[in-house]
Amino acid sequence: MLRRLSKNQPEEFKFTKVNLNWAKAQINKYPKGRQASAVIPLLWKAQEQEGWVSKPAIEFVAEFLDMPEVRVLEVATFYFMFHLNPVGSKAHFQVCGTTPCMLRGSEDLINVCKARISKKQHSLSTD
């Protein structure tokens, strides 16, 4: 499944003071020259802070870790745990779409979600 960044992006992203200190502590856990290994924890913290991973957050993490932005984008788009679009604040549903899950009936579950929540996948309901 191709994953793209949301068309609607915030102007900027910065870690809060607490999260910035946390990020620095994470980077210090890695040997010199291996700070890029902290990309997943930093993306996770960015998502925790704003509810999803925005393009400005990806740019911020890339600059913070002194790594190419495209490498951070690759990580963010590869792992489904990173939400590239805003998600609901009350509930967020994800249904496995792999072949084994489909064989066990995940398509039926997706259809129930479409009928009860939103006809369009990857969208927010009005409530």
Stretches with model-predicted labels:
Residues 1-127:
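Signature of N-terminal electron-transfer/Fe-S-associated modules in redox systems
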